[in-house]
Regions:
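Carbohydrate-binding surfaces in secreted/extracellular proteins
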Residues: 40, 117, 177-214, 240
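Extracellular carbohydrate-recognition regions
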Residues: 32-64, 251-254, 267
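Extracellular, beta-strand-rich glycan-interacting domains
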Residues: 38-39, 232-251
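Secretory/extracellular carbohydrate-interaction modules
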Residues: 84-156
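Short, aromatic/His-centered strand-loop micro-motif at the edge of beta-sheets
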Residues: 160-183
Length: 267
């Protein structure tokens, strides 16, 4: 089984055994409106157990995911005026589906929640099985999953919302460009029956919530108890945030003291 493969002297493989006391300490959100955050800061010796708001470490998983070839990077993905710290996680293009999942300490299933993350296409766009897709999933209790990112069919050059697997695709105005970091923010409104999801692409950090976005209203997730990184293409992902307010998933600032800097983007 492939695993998260740290570079530069970090762990050689994903550690799946965690000490309960350490997990509980890491799983408690620092603020009431912050549900979870993952900046991919190394946490030796439990590398895959960093961040906050989770009930355990990252592990291989996802529909038809037979590998998890994600590599921790020393540097972060960055976005203007968005606070960042730690490193990031990347993957090359693969001939099979890759996936890693992580359980939330606080499941999502009522009210409004915001999810944000940074994503950057790498290598040759569309390389990898199923046109080199990549993104983040919200995994529901009814057998449904929301996919946020670059799809494997349809509008393969844009960021979308869709059912994991490609059904119900909703296009955004954001295009996928190799080497360019993009901030994706999803407003998830959980309600009886179908939920309502709105995707904002590259909103300004520290600004008010946008009035428009790509809207998906044909999916009922039930209760979301885990998130996933799901891909076959070359990309990097960073700064996953989940909170009950828009402001908390877009904290303003620059690099934190623990950050060694940003991945350089082409001009």
């Amino acid at each position: 089984m492939d695993s998260l493969r740290p570079r530069r002297g970090l762990l050689a493989a994903l550690v799946t055994v965690a000490f309960p006391s350490m997990v509980l300490a890491l799983a408690s959100p620092a603020r009431a409106d912050v549900v979870a955050r993952e900046s991919f800061v190394p946490s030796f010796p439990l590398y895959a157990n960093g961040g906050s708001g989770f009930a355990g470490p990252w592990r291989q998983g996802g529909f038809n995911a037979f590998a998890s070839g994600y590599v921790p990077e020393d540097r972060s993905l960055c976005h203007p005026r968005l606070r960042n710290e730690g490193g990031s996680v990347s993957s090359v293009a693969h001939p099979s589906i890759n996936g890693a999942i992580r359980d939330l300490a606080q499941p999502l299933g009522a009210g409004t929640v915001y999810v944000s993350f940074l994503v950057q296409p790498l290598g040759t766009l569309h390389a990898g099985v199923f046109n080199g897709f990549f993104g983040l999933t919200l995994n529901g209790s009814l057998g449904n999953e929301l996919f946020i990112g670059k799809p494997g069919a349809g509008a393969v050059s844009q960021y979308v919302l869709e059912n994991r697997g490609g059904f119900g695709q909703v296009l955004s105005n954001g295009s996928t460009t190799t080497g360019r970091s993009t901030l994706l923010v999803v407003k998830a409104q959980f309600m009886p029956g179908n939920d309502l999801f709105t995707l904002y692409v590259d909103p300004a950090a520290s600004a008010t919530e946008p009035t428009g976005g790509a809207v998906k209203a044909d999916l009922d997730l039930g209760t979301v108890s885990r998130i996933g990184i799901y891909s076959s293409g070359a990309f990097a992902i960073d700064e996953i945030r989940i909170a009950t307010t828009y402001a908390e998933v877009l904290p303003s600032g620059g690099q934190a003291g623990s950050s060694p800097g940003c991945l350089v983007e082409p001009r």
